[in-house]
Amino acid sequence: MSEQHAQGADAVVDLNNELKTRREKLANLREQGIAFPNDFRRDHTSDQLHTEFDGKENEELEALNIEVAVAGRMMTRRIMGKASFVTLQDVGGRIQLYVARDDLPEGVYNEQFKKWDLGDILGAKGKLFKTKTGELSIHCTELRLLTKALRPLPDKFHGLQDQEARYRQRYLDLISNDESRNTFKVRSQILSGIRQFMVNRGFMEVETPMMQVIPGGAAARPFITHHNALDLDMYLRIAPELYLKRLVVGGFERVFEINRNFRNEGISVRHNPEFTMMELYMAYADYKDLIELTESLFRTLAQNILGKTEVTYGDVTLDFGKPFEKLTMREAIKKYRPETDMADLDNFDSAKAIAESIGIHVEKSWGLGRIVTEIFEEVAEAHLIQPTFITEYPAEVSPLARRNDVNPEITDRFEFFIGGREIGNGFSELNDAEDQAQRFLDQVAAKDAGDDEAMFYDEDYVTALEHGLPPTAGLGIGIDRMVMLFTNSHTIRDVILFPAMRPVK
C-alpha cells in the first residue's frame, strides 16, 4: 500500500500526535549534528531535466551517463522492500527518484530515508534513466534530508479544499495545487512582459509615493495612516496619477509605474482593497494613441505568454487578435437597452426616470453625466464580454480628463472592458490649469454634499499644471483583472498571493 494512499484514506489524522512524532524525529536529528544543513547545491530543476531529456530513450541516457543533483519537497513515496520511488517537487514541477537500499551508503535507506515524512525537503544526486513505463527518473546514489517538515501536507488526492484556507495558507495552496502555481507564474510573466513592452516603446519606469498628504487620481475612499515623525495624518495612495503627470511636466515624456493602490472599499470577486495597477503617461499623444497601445499590449502578451491571441475565459473565447469593438457610452446603452430614447439621455429628468426605472437610486449630488454613467454600468457593462472600448465619458465623472473639442460636456476618455469587467481607463489629460482648478472645486462641493469618494483639492498639482503640461495621454490597467483573464480565474483572490482576509478569531 503506497504511503500517499494511506495518508489520503485516514481523514481523521490526529494532528497533535503527528506533530509530536515529527518533533521527536527533529530532536533526534539535532542530536546527530546539523539538523538543517545548507551545503547541498543542485545543478538542475525538474523542468530543465524534462525539457532536455524527456525525448531521449533509456539506452541513450545510459550511454550519456549523466549525473545530476536536484532538491525539493517529497510529495509521494512508494516503499517496496529494498527499493522505493519518490516524487520530488521543486519550482519547475516534479521528477521521480528511484531509491535503492544497496545504492546508498550503509544505513541511509533503513535508518534515515524510511523514517522521513511526506513534505520533508530532500537533496538527491544520481544518474538519469527511464523506467519501463518511460518516465524520466533519477537513480539515487546520494540522498539527504535538508529540512524536516513538522506539519503534514494536505491530503494528496483532495488537496486544500477549503477555499478560505487556500488564501490564508497560500504556501499550502502552492505546494498542493498545480493550477495555483501556474496562475502566479503567468502573473509574473505578465508583469515582465508589460515592462519589456513599455521599455521597447521608449517608456521609463518610475516610482512615486505610496503615502500621500492629499490622495488623488481616482474617485475612491482612502486609507488613513499617521506619520509619527511629522505628526501628520497621511493617506495610502488611491492612484499615482497626479505624481506621474508632475514628472511629465518635469520633462520625462514617457513614464510608467507598476505598483499597489489602496482603496478603503468593499471586497468582492473583482475588488481587493490592495491591488496592482500599471499607469502610463505619454506626452504628445491623445486617447486614440492609447487605444492602439492597449490593443497591441494585450495582443503581444497573449501571443508571447499563451502562444495564441485567443484566450479561454469561462465558457467564452476572447479574441485579442482582431480590433477591439468601439462604442460610445450612449451607443452601448442603446445597444443593450434598445427601448432607450437617446434624447432622454440629454435631459436630467428623463435620464433620472430611466435610472430609477431600472433600480438605480439617484443621489442628490448627481448631475446628468453621473446618471448616464450609472445607467450604462447597469444595462451594458456586464454584456461587454469581448474586448470593447467605451468612449465619450461625461466630464462630470472625469475630473482629470480633457474636454472634447466639439462637445465640452464629454471628455476624450475611454474605459475598456473584457469579460464584463472594466480592465482599464485612459484619456487625453486635462492640461488646462484653470479648468482643473474649477473641477477640483466641483469635487470639493460634491464631497461636502456627501460624496466620500470625491477628490480633494490638490493645490500643488494645479501649480504644476501652471508650469505647463504638454498635450498628454494617460492609461491605467488593473493587473489583477488582467491576470484573471489570462489564467481563467473568476475571483480576484485567486490571482493575489495574499488577499485581504478577516483575522481568524
From Swiss-Prot:
Its cofactor is Mg(2+). It comes from the Bacteria. Keywords: Aminoacyl-tRNA synthetase, ATP-binding, Cytoplasm, Ligase, Magnesium, Metal-binding, Nucleotide-binding, Protein biosynthesis. Mg(2+) 2 binds at residue 422. It is found in: Cytoplasm. Its main location: cytoplasm. GO terms for cellular component: cytosol. GO terms for molecular function: ATP binding; lysine-tRNA ligase activity; magnesium ion binding; tRNA binding. Its EC number is 6.1.1.6. Mg(2+) 1 binds at residues 415, 422. CDD domains: LysRS_core, LysRS_N. InterPro entries: Aa-tRNA-synt_II (IPR004364), aa-tRNA-synth_II (IPR006195), aa-tRNA-synth_II/BPL/LPL (IPR045864), Lys-tRNA-ligase_II (IPR002313), Lys-tRNA-ligase_II_bac/euk (IPR034762), Lys-tRNA-ligase_II_N (IPR044136), Lys-tRNA-synth_II_C (IPR018149), NA-bd_OB-fold (IPR012340). One of its GO terms (biological process) is lysyl-tRNA aminoacylation. Binds 3 Mg(2+) ions per subunit. It is an enzyme of class 6 (ligase). It catalyses: tRNA(Lys) + L-lysine + ATP = L-lysyl-tRNA(Lys) + AMP + diphosphate. Homodimer. PANTHER family: LYSINE--TRNA LIGASE, CHLOROPLASTIC_MITOCHONDRIAL, LYSYL-TRNA SYNTHETASE. Belongs to the class-II aminoacyl-tRNA synthetase family. This is Lysine--tRNA ligase.
